[in-house]
């Protein structure tokens, strides 16, 4: 697209497709060299003034290049900040947190063992109380079961005693009667 192209080739039109479509190539060869140069110059002027594709492409490439460089620099800064933050955390915060955790963990472990021991004692007491309650409940249940049996036995004993007393009384009366009869018979 420069004016320094060789003149040995027939007219090399670098202009817009519109200009190229106006004249066929064969007609350009039949024209004179002055006309060819004018057409060539017009094509170059047209391409420089009206054809902005190369400029736009160049600007686009430049913008993309600058954008990628800035983006790369921004990403590098972000990565560098992350690396610094991680290094600081590893060097300062992590050891501090670890030591605090170890200190607190020891005290928490002691408290946990104490609580565990206390809970174990409470469970033992509850178990003993449950056994006593079960034993008392069993005794009360047994008493409740045996009370009617004992009352029944007492009633039967009283009935038997009453029958025995009545039988003894009858026997005494019988012996008294027999003794009277015997004494009557002896006196005869």
Swiss-Prot record:
Answer yes or no on keyword Ribonucleoprotein: no
Subunit structure and binding partners: Component of the biogenesis of lysosome-related organelles complex 1 (BLOC-1).
What is any one of the record's Gene Ontology cellular component terms? transport vesicle
Provide the coiled-coil residue spans.
101-183
**Originating species:** Xenopus laevis (African clawed frog)
Q: Which UniProt keywords apply?
A: Coiled coil
Q: What is the recorded function of this protein according to its Swiss-Prot or TrEMBL entry?
A: Component of the BLOC-1 complex, a complex that is required for normal biogenesis of lysosome-related organelles (LRO), such as platelet dense granules and melanosomes. Plays a role in intracellular vesicle trafficking.
Q: Where is the composition biased (Polar residues)?
A: 10-19
State the Pfam families in the record.
Muted
Which protein, by its recorded name, is this? Biogenesis of lysosome-related organelles complex 1 subunit 5
- Specify where the region named Disordered lies, as residue ranges: 1-24
């Amino acid at each position: 697209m420069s004016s320094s192209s060789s003149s040995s080739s027939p007219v090399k039109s670098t202009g817009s497709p519109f200009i190229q479509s106006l004249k066929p190539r064969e007609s350009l060869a039949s024209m004179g060299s002055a006309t060819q140069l004018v057409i060539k110059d017009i094509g170059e002027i047209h391409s420089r003034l009206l054809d902005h594709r190369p400029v736009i492409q160049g600007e686009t490439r430049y913008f993309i290049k600058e954008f990628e460089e800035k983006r790369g620099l921004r990403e590098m800064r972000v990565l560098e900040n992350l690396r610094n933050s991680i290094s600081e955390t590893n060097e300062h915060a992590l050891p501090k947190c670890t030591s605090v955790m170890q200190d607190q963990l020891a005290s928490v472990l002691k408290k946990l063992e104490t609580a565990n021991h206390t809970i174990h004692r409470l469970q033992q007491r509850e178990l003993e109380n449950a056994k006593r309650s079960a034993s008392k409940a069993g005794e009360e249940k047994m008493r409740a079961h045996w009370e009617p049996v004992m009352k029944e036995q007492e009633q039967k004993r009283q009935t038997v005693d009453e029958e025995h007393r009545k039988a003894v009384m009858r026997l005494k009366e019988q012996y008294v009667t027999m003794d009277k009869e015997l004494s009557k018979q002896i006196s005869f």
